[in-house]
Protein backbone atom coordinates (compact mmCIF):
# COMPACT_ATOMS: atom_id res chain seq x y z
CA UNK A 1 0.00 0.00 0.00
CA UNK A 2 2.68 2.49 1.03
CA UNK A 3 5.42 1.57 -1.39
CA UNK A 4 8.03 4.24 -2.22
CA UNK A 5 6.51 5.12 -5.59
CA UNK A 6 3.05 5.61 -4.09
CA UNK A 7 4.45 7.79 -1.30
CA UNK A 8 6.42 9.91 -3.79
CA UNK A 9 3.27 10.38 -5.86
CA UNK A 10 1.14 11.35 -2.87
CA UNK A 11 3.75 13.82 -1.57
CA UNK A 12 4.17 15.40 -5.02
CA UNK A 13 0.42 15.94 -5.43
CA UNK A 14 0.13 17.32 -1.89
CA UNK A 15 3.02 19.74 -2.40
CA UNK A 16 2.04 20.95 -5.88
CA UNK A 17 -1.76 20.89 -5.42
CA UNK A 18 -2.13 19.49 -8.90
CA UNK A 19 -2.06 16.11 -10.63
CA UNK A 20 -0.51 17.64 -13.74
CA UNK A 21 2.25 19.47 -11.83
CA UNK A 22 2.99 16.32 -9.86
CA UNK A 23 3.24 14.43 -13.15
CA UNK A 24 5.75 16.97 -14.45
CA UNK A 25 7.83 16.70 -11.28
CA UNK A 26 7.91 12.90 -11.38
CA UNK A 27 8.15 12.59 -15.19
CA UNK A 28 4.92 10.60 -15.32
CA UNK A 29 1.63 11.04 -17.14
CA UNK A 30 -1.24 12.76 -15.38
CA UNK A 31 -3.30 9.60 -15.82
CA UNK A 32 -0.65 7.57 -13.97
CA UNK A 33 -0.62 10.05 -11.09
CA UNK A 34 -4.42 10.10 -10.89
CA UNK A 35 -4.58 6.30 -10.93
CA UNK A 36 -2.04 5.93 -8.12
CA UNK A 37 -3.88 8.40 -5.89
CA UNK A 38 -7.23 6.71 -6.62
CA UNK A 39 -5.73 3.31 -5.76
CA UNK A 40 -4.21 4.69 -2.54
CA UNK A 41 -7.57 6.11 -1.48
CA UNK A 42 -9.28 2.80 -2.24
CA UNK A 43 -6.69 0.86 -0.23
CA UNK A 44 -6.90 3.19 2.76
CA UNK A 45 -10.68 3.53 2.55
CA UNK A 46 -10.59 7.33 2.96
CA UNK A 47 -10.53 10.37 0.70
CA UNK A 48 -7.14 12.05 0.85
CA UNK A 49 -7.87 15.02 -1.43
CA UNK A 50 -10.68 17.45 -2.18
CA UNK A 51 -10.83 17.78 -5.96
CA UNK A 52 -11.88 20.86 -7.94
CA UNK A 53 -11.51 21.65 -11.63
CA UNK A 54 -8.41 23.74 -10.90
CA UNK A 55 -6.66 22.11 -7.96
CA UNK A 56 -6.63 19.44 -5.30
CA UNK A 57 -6.28 20.08 -1.57
CA UNK A 58 -5.71 17.72 1.32
CA UNK A 59 -8.49 16.41 3.50
CA UNK A 60 -7.89 16.04 7.24
CA UNK A 61 -6.88 12.42 6.60
CA UNK A 62 -4.58 13.59 3.82
CA UNK A 63 -2.94 16.14 6.12
CA UNK A 64 -2.29 13.41 8.66
CA UNK A 65 -0.80 11.10 6.04
CA UNK A 66 1.45 13.86 4.72
CA UNK A 67 2.78 14.49 8.24
CA UNK A 68 4.05 10.90 8.24
CA UNK A 69 4.71 10.19 4.57
CA UNK A 70 7.94 12.14 4.21
CA UNK A 71 9.52 10.29 7.13
CA UNK A 72 8.29 6.93 5.82
CA UNK A 73 9.71 7.62 2.37
CA UNK A 74 13.04 8.74 3.79
CA UNK A 75 13.17 5.60 5.93
CA UNK A 76 12.33 3.31 3.00
CA UNK A 77 14.91 4.96 0.74
CA UNK A 78 17.66 4.75 3.36
CA UNK A 79 16.89 1.20 4.48
CA UNK A 80 19.14 -0.64 1.95
CA UNK A 81 22.17 1.40 3.03
CA UNK A 82 21.22 1.03 6.69
CA UNK A 83 20.92 -2.74 6.35
CA UNK A 84 24.28 -2.86 4.59
CA UNK A 85 25.85 -0.93 7.46
CA UNK A 86 24.42 -3.40 10.00
CA UNK A 87 25.63 -6.29 7.85
CA UNK A 88 29.11 -4.75 7.85
CA UNK A 89 29.24 -4.82 11.66
CA UNK A 90 28.41 -1.18 12.33
CA UNK A 91 26.49 -0.46 15.52
CA UNK A 92 22.99 0.99 15.39
CA UNK A 93 23.78 3.01 18.54
CA UNK A 94 27.01 4.03 20.23
CA UNK A 95 26.97 5.53 23.74
CA UNK A 96 30.08 7.53 24.66
CA UNK A 97 30.83 8.87 28.14
CA UNK A 98 33.38 11.67 28.59
CA UNK A 99 35.18 12.71 31.76
CA UNK A 100 34.32 16.24 32.83
CA UNK A 101 38.05 17.05 32.87
CA UNK A 102 38.37 16.22 29.17
CA UNK A 103 35.00 17.52 28.02
CA UNK A 104 35.45 20.10 25.28
CA UNK A 105 32.37 21.12 23.24
CA UNK A 106 34.42 21.82 20.12
CA UNK A 107 36.23 18.48 20.41
CA UNK A 108 32.92 16.66 20.87
CA UNK A 109 31.44 18.40 17.82
CA UNK A 110 34.50 17.56 15.72
CA UNK A 111 34.36 13.89 16.72
CA UNK A 112 30.62 13.69 16.03
CA UNK A 113 31.05 15.32 12.61
CA UNK A 114 33.73 12.76 11.74
CA UNK A 115 31.58 9.85 12.95
CA UNK A 116 28.34 11.07 11.40
CA UNK A 117 29.97 11.36 7.99
CA UNK A 118 31.11 7.73 8.13
CA UNK A 119 28.16 6.21 9.97
CA UNK A 120 25.05 8.20 8.96
CA UNK A 121 22.63 5.58 10.31
CA UNK A 122 24.23 5.15 13.74
CA UNK A 123 22.70 6.94 16.72
CA UNK A 124 25.34 8.61 18.92
CA UNK A 125 24.67 9.44 22.58
CA UNK A 126 27.19 11.59 24.47
CA UNK A 127 27.24 11.80 28.28
CA UNK A 128 29.42 13.98 30.53
CA UNK A 129 30.35 12.46 33.90
CA UNK A 130 32.64 13.23 36.83
CA UNK A 131 35.34 11.02 38.39
CA UNK A 132 33.95 7.52 39.09
CA UNK A 133 30.75 8.40 37.26
CA UNK A 134 32.65 7.62 34.06
CA UNK A 135 33.33 4.03 35.16
CA UNK A 136 29.76 3.82 36.44
CA UNK A 137 28.42 4.51 32.96
CA UNK A 138 30.61 1.81 31.44
CA UNK A 139 29.97 -0.86 34.05
CA UNK A 140 26.29 -0.39 34.79
CA UNK A 141 24.65 1.73 32.09
CA UNK A 142 25.69 0.00 28.89
CA UNK A 143 28.01 2.65 27.49
CA UNK A 144 30.27 1.46 24.68
CA UNK A 145 33.34 3.62 25.23
CA UNK A 146 34.72 6.12 27.75
CA UNK A 147 37.06 9.03 27.12
CA UNK A 148 38.87 9.57 30.40
CA UNK A 149 38.24 6.81 32.92
CA UNK A 150 40.26 7.29 36.10
CA UNK A 151 43.45 5.26 36.37
CA UNK A 152 45.34 3.05 33.98
CA UNK A 153 43.90 -0.31 35.05
CA UNK A 154 40.42 -1.56 34.21
CA UNK A 155 37.89 -2.14 36.98
CA UNK A 156 36.69 -5.23 35.09
CA UNK A 157 38.56 -7.62 32.79
CA UNK A 158 35.98 -7.08 30.05
CA UNK A 159 37.48 -3.69 29.20
CA UNK A 160 40.60 -2.59 27.34
CA UNK A 161 42.44 0.60 28.30
CA UNK A 162 44.75 3.02 26.53
CA UNK A 163 46.45 5.57 28.84
CA UNK A 164 45.84 9.10 27.57
CA UNK A 165 47.94 11.13 30.00
CA UNK A 166 47.99 12.58 33.50
CA UNK A 167 46.34 15.78 34.68
CA UNK A 168 48.69 18.05 36.67
CA UNK A 169 47.10 20.13 39.45
CA UNK A 170 47.62 23.55 41.02
CA UNK A 171 46.13 24.76 44.30
CA UNK A 172 44.63 28.15 43.51
CA UNK A 173 42.72 31.13 44.83
CA UNK A 174 41.84 34.60 43.57
CA UNK A 175 44.72 37.08 43.41
CA UNK A 176 43.07 39.26 46.06
CA UNK A 177 42.24 36.35 48.38
CA UNK A 178 43.34 36.78 52.05
CA UNK A 179 45.68 33.78 51.72
CA UNK A 180 47.27 34.94 48.47
CA UNK A 181 50.29 36.53 50.16
CA UNK A 182 50.57 34.40 53.29
CA UNK A 183 53.88 32.58 53.76
CA UNK A 184 53.98 29.04 52.35
CA UNK A 185 53.25 26.29 52.98
CA UNK A 186 49.79 27.30 54.12
CA UNK A 187 48.64 25.47 57.24
CA UNK A 188 45.44 23.49 57.57
CA UNK A 189 44.23 25.96 60.17
CA UNK A 190 44.65 28.80 57.69
CA UNK A 191 42.99 26.87 54.85
CA UNK A 192 40.03 25.70 56.93
CA UNK A 193 38.77 29.26 57.32
CA UNK A 194 37.78 29.43 53.64
CA UNK A 195 35.35 27.32 51.57
CA UNK A 196 36.60 24.56 49.28
CA UNK A 197 35.00 24.73 45.82
CA UNK A 198 34.46 21.25 44.39
CA UNK A 199 32.62 19.28 41.71
CA UNK A 200 30.80 16.27 43.11
CA UNK A 201 31.55 12.78 41.80
CA UNK A 202 28.62 11.69 39.59
CA UNK A 203 28.88 7.94 40.39
CA UNK A 204 25.51 6.34 41.09
CA UNK A 205 26.60 2.78 41.93
CA UNK A 206 30.34 2.90 42.60
CA UNK A 207 31.71 4.66 45.67
CA UNK A 208 32.12 8.37 45.04
CA UNK A 209 35.59 9.86 45.26
CA UNK A 210 35.88 12.63 47.82
CA UNK A 211 37.38 15.86 46.50
CA UNK A 212 39.87 17.96 48.50
CA UNK A 213 38.30 19.23 51.70
CA UNK A 214 39.64 19.49 55.25
CA UNK A 215 37.66 18.21 58.25
CA UNK A 216 35.29 20.93 59.40
CA UNK A 217 35.84 23.03 56.28
CA UNK A 218 32.87 24.50 54.43
CA UNK A 219 32.36 23.02 50.96
CA UNK A 220 30.67 24.59 47.94
CA UNK A 221 29.54 22.11 45.28
CA UNK A 222 29.28 23.30 41.68
CA UNK A 223 28.12 21.32 38.61
CA UNK A 224 31.08 21.65 36.25
CA UNK A 225 34.63 22.85 35.69
CA UNK A 226 33.55 26.12 34.10
CA UNK A 227 31.63 27.10 37.24
CA UNK A 228 34.47 25.99 39.51
CA UNK A 229 36.95 28.20 37.66
CA UNK A 230 34.54 31.14 37.77
CA UNK A 231 34.05 30.63 41.51
CA UNK A 232 37.79 30.72 42.16
CA UNK A 233 38.17 33.86 40.05
CA UNK A 234 35.37 35.50 42.02
CA UNK A 235 37.10 34.71 45.31
CA UNK A 236 34.32 32.37 46.44
CA UNK A 237 36.69 29.68 47.65
CA UNK A 238 39.92 27.75 47.25
CA UNK A 239 40.88 24.41 45.72
CA UNK A 240 42.68 22.49 43.00
CA UNK A 241 42.42 23.16 39.26
CA UNK A 242 44.11 21.39 36.32
CA UNK A 243 47.34 23.22 35.54
CA UNK A 244 46.57 23.51 31.83
CA UNK A 245 43.25 25.22 32.58
CA UNK A 246 44.52 27.73 35.14
CA UNK A 247 48.15 28.47 34.21
CA UNK A 248 47.25 31.41 31.95
CA UNK A 249 45.14 32.89 34.77
CA UNK A 250 48.09 32.48 37.14
CA UNK A 251 50.42 34.10 34.61
CA UNK A 252 48.17 37.14 34.19
CA UNK A 253 47.65 37.37 37.98
CA UNK A 254 43.94 36.57 38.04
CA UNK A 255 44.70 33.53 40.19
CA UNK A 256 47.50 32.69 42.61
CA UNK A 257 49.00 29.20 42.98
CA UNK A 258 50.02 28.25 46.51
CA UNK A 259 51.66 25.29 48.25
CA UNK A 260 49.68 23.42 50.91
CA UNK A 261 50.74 20.54 53.20
CA UNK A 262 49.19 17.85 50.98
CA UNK A 263 49.42 18.62 47.28
CA UNK A 264 47.28 16.66 44.84
CA UNK A 265 49.23 14.08 42.80
CA UNK A 266 48.79 13.82 39.01
CA UNK A 267 45.59 12.08 37.88
CA UNK A 268 46.09 9.47 35.13
CA UNK A 269 43.18 9.09 32.71
CA UNK A 270 42.58 6.46 30.03
CA UNK A 271 40.42 5.55 27.08
CA UNK A 272 38.31 2.48 27.89
CA UNK A 273 36.16 0.25 25.69
CA UNK A 274 34.63 -3.21 25.79
CA UNK A 275 36.94 -6.02 24.70
CA UNK A 276 34.15 -8.02 23.11
CA UNK A 277 31.22 -7.04 20.93
CA UNK A 278 32.46 -3.65 19.79
CA UNK A 279 31.47 -2.66 16.28
CA UNK A 280 33.25 -0.66 13.61
CA UNK A 281 32.34 2.77 14.95
CA UNK A 282 33.86 2.06 18.37
CA UNK A 283 36.89 0.47 16.72
CA UNK A 284 37.39 3.61 14.65
CA UNK A 285 37.17 5.85 17.72
CA UNK A 286 39.77 3.70 19.47
CA UNK A 287 42.03 4.02 16.43
CA UNK A 288 41.66 7.80 16.44
CA UNK A 289 42.91 7.90 20.03
CA UNK A 290 45.62 5.25 19.85
CA UNK A 291 47.06 6.95 16.77
CA UNK A 292 46.58 10.41 18.33
CA UNK A 293 44.80 11.66 15.22
CA UNK A 294 44.00 15.39 14.82
CA UNK A 295 40.27 14.66 15.04
CA UNK A 296 40.55 13.98 18.79
CA UNK A 297 43.35 16.39 19.75
CA UNK A 298 40.93 18.68 21.58
CA UNK A 299 40.30 16.01 24.20
CA UNK A 300 44.01 15.79 25.02
CA UNK A 301 44.81 19.48 25.48
CA UNK A 302 44.45 19.21 29.25
CA UNK A 303 47.49 16.90 29.43
CA UNK A 304 49.94 19.20 27.71
CA UNK A 305 51.98 16.17 26.64
CA UNK A 306 49.76 13.11 26.04
CA UNK A 307 50.77 9.86 27.74
CA UNK A 308 52.74 11.86 30.35
UniProtKB/Swiss-Prot annotation:
Residues 19-38 bind DNA. InterPro entries: LTTR (IPR050176), LysR_subst-bd (IPR005119), Tscrpt_reg_HTH_LysR (IPR000847), WH-like_DNA-bd_sf (IPR036388), WH_DNA-bd_sf (IPR036390). GO terms for biological process: positive regulation of DNA-templated transcription; regulation of DNA-templated transcription. Keywords: Activator, DNA-binding, Transcription, Transcription regulation. It comes from Escherichia coli (strain K12). Induction: Induced anaerobically and by nitrogen limitation. Repressed by AllR. The keyword Transcription regulation applies. This is HTH-type transcriptional activator AllS.
Amino acid sequence: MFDPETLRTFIAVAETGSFSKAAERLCKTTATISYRIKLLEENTGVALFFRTTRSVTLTAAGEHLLSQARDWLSWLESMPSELQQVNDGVERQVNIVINNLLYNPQAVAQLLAWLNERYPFTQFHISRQIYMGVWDSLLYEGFSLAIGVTGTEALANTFSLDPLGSVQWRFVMAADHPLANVEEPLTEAQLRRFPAVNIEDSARTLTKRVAWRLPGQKEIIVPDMETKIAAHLAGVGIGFLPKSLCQSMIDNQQLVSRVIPTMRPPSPLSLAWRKFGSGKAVEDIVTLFTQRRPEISGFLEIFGNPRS
